[in-house]
Amino acid sequence: MDCVESYLSGDNSDESPVMHTWFSPSPSPSDSSSSPSSSASSSIGRNSDDGEKSSEDGGDDAGENEVESPYKGPLEMMESLEQVLPVRKGISKYYSGKSKSFTNLTAEAASALTSSSSMKDLAKPENPYSRRRRNLLCHQIWENNKTTPRGGISKKHVMSSSRSALTLAMAVAAGVMTGEGSSSGGDSSPGSSPTTSGSPPRQLHHHQHQMKKLPPLYPRSQGSFGNLTSSQSSLGFCAWRSFSVADFPRCFPATASGIGFNDS
C-alpha cells in the first residue's frame, strides 16, 4: 500500500481518480500465497471448508449413535430373526405365534399325532350349519342324477311306447269294423247265400276305394312301415297315415255313422 500512496502523491491532480485505480499495481503471487488470511477470507473457500467439517462431524456422530443388536449368534431360526429385525410392535403382536418356521410346524404336527386325541384336534369342528349344508348338497346331487336322462335310451323307450299305443288304437278300430261287418252278415236272410259269399270282395273293393280318397303316405312312413302296411291291408287295417278329424268318417264309416258323422 505504500507504493500505491507514493504513486498517487507523485501524480498530477488533474488526472481523474479512475486512472489512479486503473493503473494501481496488483499484488504479486508471492504476497497472496504468504498471506493466509486472504485465502481464509474468501467466501467460497470458507463455505467449502465449513461443509467438509460439518460432514466429518456428522459421520463421527452417526458412528457414535449406531445401534448394534445384542444378539451375536447365527440367524437360523425365526425367533432369532424376530429379535434382531426392527419390526413394529403392532405387527409383531398381530403375527405373534403365526409366522413361524416350518421346523416348528413339523414338530407340532408330530407331537399332535403322537398324542391320544390327535384326530379330534386335527379334525374340523362341525356345527349344525355345516351339517345342514352337506345334507342339502348330497340331496341336490341325488335329485339331479334321478331326473337327468341318460343318452338315447329314454328317447327310444318313448318312441316304442307311442308306437305301441298307436298300434293298440288301430287294432281296436279294426275290431269294431270287423264286429259290425259280421253282425250285418248275420242279419241277412238265409236265402241270399250268393250275396254273403260275395261280401268279402265287396268289402275289399270298398276298402280300396276309401284308400284312394285318403291323402298320400309320407315317404318315411312308406319305407319304415311298408311291411306292416301290407300285412294290415289284408286284415282290413288302415295304412299308417297322419289323420285328422275330417278323415275319420272316411276311414271308419260304420263307427262315424254310429257316432253321428256324415260322409263328406
Curated annotation (Swiss-Prot):
Basic and acidic residues compositional bias, start-end? 47-56
Name the domain of life. Eukaryota
Chain residue ranges for the region called Disordered: 1-76, 178-225
Q: Where is the composition biased (Low complexity)?
A: 29-43, 179-201
State the compartments where it is located.
Nucleus
In what ranges is there compositional bias, type Basic residues? Answer: 203-212
Q: Where does this chain mainly localize?
A: nucleus
Q: Which GO terms describe its biological process?
A: response to oxidative stress; response to zinc ion
Q: Quote the biased-composition stretches of kind Acidic residues, using this chain's numbering.
A: 57-67
Q: Which UniProt keywords are listed?
A: Kinase, Nucleus, Stress response, Transferase
One Gene Ontology CC term in the entry: nucleus
Segments passing through the bilayer: none
Q: Name one GO molecular function term.
A: kinase activity
Function of the protein? Promotes slightly the tolerance to zinc (Zn) and to oxidizing chemicals (e.g. diamide).
Q: What name does this protein carry?
A: Protein OXIDATIVE STRESS 3 LIKE 1
- The protein's organism comes out as Arabidopsis thaliana (Mouse-ear cress)
